[in-house]
Design a protein with these regions (language model features):
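Sec-dependent N-terminal signal peptides
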Residues: 1-2
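Repetitive, compositionally biased segments used for assembly/scaffolding
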Residues: 14-124
Length: 124
């Protein structure tokens, strides 16, 4: 099975982190468990790194990069950019929660969205 991103994530090398999260699906912890895309290369239409796709565009309501959306606002409890949220999006791979996408440093097994983008966008 997939090991939990046993952290701190900072102990991982960038390569290791990107390998672990590659292919993970991002699921919100809202009542609908809204799909927020996949952690895959930017050519994948479902990728959070595809700026023209549903999940990578800063204009899409289901994109974490839309700062005015439920899932991108730093004030929304479901957003990975909310540094105080206890309900950030889950990273799910092979049917298991492997970690969380969150700017809240108190969340175990989490990586901040901007860090994930900086480390992995060009590696996947």
């Amino acid at each position: 099975g997939t090991a939990l991103l046993s952290f701190s994530l900072s102990s991982f090398g960038a390569n290791q982190l990107c390998n672990v999260v590659n292919g993970a699906v991002l699921i919100a912890q809202d009542p609908q468990n809204t799909k927020l895309g996949k952690v895959t290369n930017s050519y994948d239409s479902d990728s959070i790194f595809n700026q023209y796709g549903t999940y990578g565009s800063e204009y899409s309501s289901n994109s974490i990069w839309n700062e005015y959306s439920t899932f991108g606002s730093e004030y929304s409890q479901y957003s990975p950019f909310n540094a105080y949220s206890s309900q950030p999006p889950m990273l799910i791979k092979q049917g298991q929660i492997i970690g969380y996408l969150s700017a809240n440093k108190r969340i175990n097994n989490s990586v901040a969205p901007n860090l994930l983008k900086a480390l992995c966008e060009d590696e996947l």
